[in-house]
């Protein structure tokens, strides 16, 4: 459950399992705080991480027929959508918009090399950067005590805060992006 920046609507996921032989299916919906004006935003069996860009638009890693799995920017209460980061964001991640709405940051789950990747992307001109690779000990891979990066912006848009176990224990780290974001 995530409220829009103006508090007028919220996102929620509806997850179900048709039978025990298949995986979970997920769709994303929005509604007013009183539960009225429900709108199905994405209904093609898979939605993962999501964030409000502004009171009307939602970025989500989801599936669309004929396209596949991508980050899509959906306009709430409409059928409008656009792909964000085509060819750059290739896997699901914890996505977040900068306070000014100009930049998207996302992480990845660790690969076989036990490295999380942290990416920054500006849709306006397709500027994109890998900000770093962060080690996660193999013994926590896929376990409840794993540590995803979960990037979050400082209010001034000059730094990102991430969770990481790159030093051997779970810590918070600041990543200075001011030279990129202005």
Q: PLM ranges: what are they?
A:
Residues 13-41, 56-58, 63-83, 109-136, ...:
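Beta-propeller blade-edge and WD-like acidic-aromatic loop motif
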Residues 1-11, 38-61, 88-107, 137-155:
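Conserved beta-propeller blade repeats
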């Amino acid at each position: 459950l995530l409220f829009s920046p103006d508090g007028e609507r919220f996102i929620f996921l509806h997850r179900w399992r048709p039978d025990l032989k298949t995986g979970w299916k997920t769709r994303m919906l929005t509604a007013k705080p009183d539960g009225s004006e429900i709108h199905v935003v994405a209904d093609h069996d898979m939605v993962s991480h999501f964030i409000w860009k502004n009171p009307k638009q939602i970025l989500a890693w989801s599936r669309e027929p004929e396209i596949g799995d991508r980050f899509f920017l959906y306009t709430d209460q409409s059928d409008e959508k656009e792909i964000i980061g085509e060819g750059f964001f290739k896997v699901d991640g914890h996505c977040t918009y900068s306070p000014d709405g100009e930049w998207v940051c996302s992480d990845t789950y660790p690969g076989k090399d036990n490295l999380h990747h942290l990416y920054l992307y500006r849709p306006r001109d397709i500027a994109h950067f890998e900000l770093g690779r962060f080690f996660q000990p193999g013994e926590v891979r896929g376990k409840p005590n794993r540590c995803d990066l979960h990037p979050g912006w400082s209010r001034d848009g000059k730094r990102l805060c991430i969770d990481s176990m790159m030093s051997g224990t779970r810590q918070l780290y600041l990543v200075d992006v001011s030279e990129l974001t202005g």
